[in-house]
Each structure stands twice: as C-alpha cells, then as structure tokens.
Amino acid sequence: MQKVVLATGNAGKVRELASLLSDFGLDIVAQTDLGVDSAEETGLTFIENAILKARHAAKVTGLPAIADDSGLAVDALGGAPGIYSARYSGEDATDQKNLQKLLETMKDVPDDQRQARFHCVLVYLRHAEDPTPLVCHGSWPGVITREPAGTGGFGYDPIFFVPSEGKTAAELTREEKSAISHRGQALKLLLDALRNG
C-alpha cells in the first residue's frame, strides 16, 4: 500500500476520505499524525488553497499528498462564506457557530432565493515539487434551510437541504452522502485520474 499524507486536521474529512481511499490501495495518514502543522491558506480560491496545503504536507513529510479545500457558496450572499467557510464566525469558529451565523445572516432571505452549492477541490501531488498536480472539482447544489435537521455529517450539513433526496445532508447516511456529495464527486474524479495514469 502506498502511504499518502492527507493535508488536513479536520476529523470529518479524514474519516470521509480515508475510508474511500483505502479501497484504492492508498494508506492515508492525516498530517496531524505526522506532526505537520496546517499550511497558511493565503489563496483566493479553493484550488489555490488545496495546492498550498498539499505542497506544504508533501514538503514536510517527503510523501505524496492529497489536500482538500472545500466550502459552501450561497448565491444570495455573493458566494460567501466560500473559502472562509471554516472560519466564517471568526477566529474561534466552530461548526455550530458558523451554522448559526449563516442562519442569522440569511434570516431575511426569501425561501426562493436560498440556493447554495458545496464545492470541493481535491489535489494530489506525487511529490512536493510536482509541476502537474491532479486537480479535481466537485459541486453539489442545495438550499439553505431555516433550521438545522439531522445529526450526521459535519459543518453546514444540518442546514443544507438536498432537493433530490428530500432531506438535509446531515440526514443522509454516509454511503448516500458519498455517492452524491461534492467531495464524493471530486474523489471519483481523482480515483479515475489515478487509475488511468
């Protein structure tokens, strides 16, 4: 099995990606388990931040690296919280504080204007100086609810309603979510690219 560092400290992302990637023969090790500090996310896009994170993890560990940068873009908010999704409520942000801030910010947004989209960019670097990283993007349309529902998932999942499923992302099973989510889409593209060379 090929050891690969996953450039995140987010336990939800580690669980979600590690289980799917282990089926592909990749031994995923979280960067925190290797003593790697988080890279500074100075990019202006999900793609830039994912490359920064992967390059940092590969450089520190000497291993191939996979990085994920993802977030929620709400149409009525001009794409916010976007790349700031994890820090939306400030320095001491938590999933709950971010979710509450978004609900408060959107309290006057009419129901027919609450469209949003989760985005996920996965980057694979074969080594720290890899000039041609694999970059895969997935997006998942939904609607921001007025109240949380469900206990699964993480982040904004309890207020992200998926019309095709008739429930929030937090009400989906892990298998259901992986099959249709932004991260599931990006991962499928990454696995296809790895498989084909």
Swiss-Prot record:
Binding of substrate occurs at: T8, G9, N10, A11, G12, K13, S70, F154, G155, Y156, D157, K177, H182, R183
Q: Does the keyword Metal-binding apply?
A: yes
Looking up Gene3D superfamilies in the UniProt record yields: 3.90.950.10
Binding of Mg(2+) occurs at E40, D69
User: What HAMAP family does this protein map onto?
Assistant: Non_canon_purine_NTPase (MF_01405)
Q: What class of enzyme is it?
A: hydrolase
Q: In the UniProt entry, which residues are flagged as the active site?
A: D69 (proton acceptor)
Q: What Pfam family is a match for this entry?
A: Ham1p_like
Share what the entry says about its subunit structure, partners included: Homodimer.
Reply yes or no: does the keyword Translocase apply.
Answer: no
The reaction(s) catalysed by this protein are:
XTP + H2O = XMP + diphosphate + H(+); dITP + H2O = dIMP + diphosphate + H(+); ITP + H2O = IMP + diphosphate + H(+)
Gene Ontology molecular function: any one: ribonucleoside triphosphate phosphatase activity
User: What does it do?
Assistant: Pyrophosphatase that catalyzes the hydrolysis of nucleoside triphosphates to their monophosphate derivatives, with a high preference for the non-canonical purine nucleotides XTP (xanthosine triphosphate), dITP (deoxyinosine triphosphate) and ITP. Seems to function as a house-cleaning enzyme that removes non-canonical purine nucleotides from the nucleotide pool, thus preventing their incorporation into DNA/RNA and avoiding chromosomal lesions.
Single Gene Ontology BP term? nucleotide metabolic process
Keywords linked to the UniProt accession? Hydrolase, Magnesium, Metal-binding, Nucleotide metabolism, Nucleotide-binding
Report which gene this protein is encoded by: rdgB
Q: Known PANTHER family for this protein?
A: INOSINE TRIPHOSPHATE PYROPHOSPHATASE (PTHR11067:SF9), INOSINE TRIPHOSPHATE PYROPHOSPHATASE/HAM1 PROTEIN (PTHR11067)
Q: Which cofactor does it need?
A: Mg(2+)
Cofactor comment = Binds 1 Mg(2+) ion per subunit.
Q: What family does this chain come from, according to its entry?
A: Belongs to the HAM1 NTPase family.
Q: What is this protein called?
A: dITP/XTP pyrophosphatase
Instruction: Name its species.
Output: Escherichia coli O6:H1 (strain CFT073 / ATCC 700928 / UPEC)
